[in-house]
Amino acid sequence: MLRERTVRLQYGSRVEAVYVLGTQLWTDVYSAAPAGAKTFSLKHSEGVKVEVVRDGEAEEVVTNGKQRWALSPSTTLRLSMAQASTEASSDKVTVNYYEEDGSAPIDQAGLFLTAIEISLDVDADRDGEVEKNNPKKASWTWGPEGQGAILLVNCDRDTPWLPKEDCSDEKVYSKQDLQDMSQMILRTKGPDRLPAGYEIVLYISMSDSDKVGVFYVENPFFGQRYIHILGRQKLYHVVKYTGGSAELLFFVEGLRFPDESFSGLVSIHVSLLEYMAEDIPLTPIFTDTVTFRIAPWIMTPNILPPVSVFVCCMKDNYLFLKEVKNLVEKTNCELKVCFQYMNRGDRWIQDEIEFGYIEAPHKGFPVVLDSPRDGNLKDFPIKQLLGPDFGYVTREPLFETVTSLDSFGNLEVSPPVTVNGKAYPLGRILIGSSFPLSGGRRMTKVVRDFLQAQQVQAPVELYSDWLTVGHVDEFMTFVPIPGKKEFRLLMASTSACYQLFREKQKEGHGEAIMFKGLGGMSSKRITINKILSNESLTQENQYFQRCLDWNRDILKKELALTEKDIIDLPALFKMDEDRQARAFFPNMVNMIVLDKDLGIPKPFGPQVEEECCLETHVRGLLEPLGLACTFIDDISAYHKFLGEVHCGTNVRRKPFTFKWWHMVP
């Protein structure tokens, strides 16, 4: 922010200058002196404060002009004013020059001043109101004491008949659209008119032009028009000076989320320009700057309350749908069914989208992240979710191959954690990747870069490429502990399964049958004894447990978890022709979490005393924590297609009460 400038005097002539309140004018009396001059005196209007600065020492000048000072190259004048002028050029400073012993001035130089107030203002203190001239408005800092304005990407669609998000064009069709934007006020105060040759200009840099847009409301009382003045091809806008005390209201929208090449910070400037002569560029004599940070996209972990549960209606999932509906009715959320005309045979709604939100002090709304997967559900987020106060964002790779790891069953987020004194109050994003140096599948770089650039939920890469589908939700999830600010990490465990089966075998239940009543699963009769005696299956699951333990160690380190924070759920996997794992029975960790109510894949485990021993075991682990276990039959509609309950559902949750700008990344 330019706060000091130099004005050059010329003996024998009158110089006019505009002074902006809060700045200082410097003028060199020595270089403006006529030949033979040795001393000078000063006269000035009462509205001007004049100081003679000699060798760094300042002396304030009274208005009568009797005192004289010796001319020297180290002598300058410092001028300031405290109030805006009511008339142009109404304040003046006169410098009289004298010969060494002369009593009458040999010449003089005059400076005629017009004082105005200019301030570009935003909500820099983040209280939802635009304050006046916050001294920290040009910078941006994190933390509860941080300063700096916040901008939302205007990625919802307030006008239903538009094909895309509101930020995709340069038009505003409603006041609702303006409410998504941050307010910016240009405050001016001064005489009815400025001296000739001055202009006030709003502008942005070329590098910010695709990241921010600014609108102005014309004729706010008679047939409002919303004028796009900055952004995209428009780098500057001349503001009409109206005189008196004025406030011009602008609305600012974000156009892009933070990304690999964009930190999220944008700046808007206002400059007062001075005209010199035709064909000579205007010169900036004052600049004020405001800085915004574009609000990041934030994921919501399982510990947050659910708002809506989404599930697809298929030809073969009527019973599954009914059980999910019964589960949802126990909670305070609503069930939203994606019917066949929209899902077009694609049941994997978890893989297509991830729900999150954006927030500023004045507003927030949910935003869905659309995966690069683009199955038959690809139109669902645009056609069914994007709307008023419901935003949309996507990232599509240009040259990378999209794999199963780009589906959002491979994108989860932890509850809030503190790791080695470093707080993650919004949790940490978890994505599955390939084993180091293996050259396997990995989530596409454009999505990873997007997640990293949001800054507030620092991602952790896990190892999921050992699985056929390769998603982190196949081996882990988080559950809240009702009534406490605690959670547990649930992990699939083949060793826990073998331990349970061996216990049941010792108790005399070795012939207990799995998949009882499901003749379509296999023509073979599968018992505990057969599983425990299958050496190849045992070896495979020992390898799979090593893969699980690798992830367990990463999660313990990156989330600062201890063994008491982790609950092992029995699981078995079998190796496919590519030596990757698929679930042997419905994978219970792939559950839906709705507060204390858990919708768990029904495992169809060995029947011990007419009860599934896997269900009994899991209830014994979770129900003492206050959680309610509902086992949902997904075996024919999801499990046989390599997915479970979590893969076939999606949950939009309430946002964090914690404000993201209060954290320090």
From Swiss-Prot:
Q: Which CDD domains match?
A: PAD_N (cd04214)
Q: Where is the signal peptide?
A: none
Tissue-specific expression: Spinal cord, submaxillary gland, cerebrum, cerebellum, and skeletal muscle.
Keyword terms: Calcium, Cytoplasm, Hydrolase, Metal-binding
Give the record's GO biological process terms.
Answer: cellular response to leukemia inhibitory factor; chromatin remodeling; estrogen receptor signaling pathway; negative regulation of chemokine-mediated signaling pathway; negative regulation of lymphocyte chemotaxis; transcription initiation-coupled chromatin remodeling
Q: Which domain of life is it from?
A: Eukaryota
Where Ca(2+) 1 binds, per the record, is at: D123, D125, D127, E131
Is this entry keyworded Cytoplasm? yes
Which Enzyme Commission numbers does its entry carry?
A: 3.5.3.15
Per UniProt, where does Ca(2+) 3 bind? D156, D158, D180, D389
Give the multimer and partner information: Homodimer.
Q: What does this protein do?
A: Catalyzes the deimination of arginine residues of proteins.
Question: What protein am I looking at?
Answer: Protein-arginine deiminase type-2
Biological source species: Rattus norvegicus
Read off the lineage from the record. Eukaryota, Metazoa, Chordata, Craniata, Vertebrata
**What gene name is listed for this protein?**
Padi2
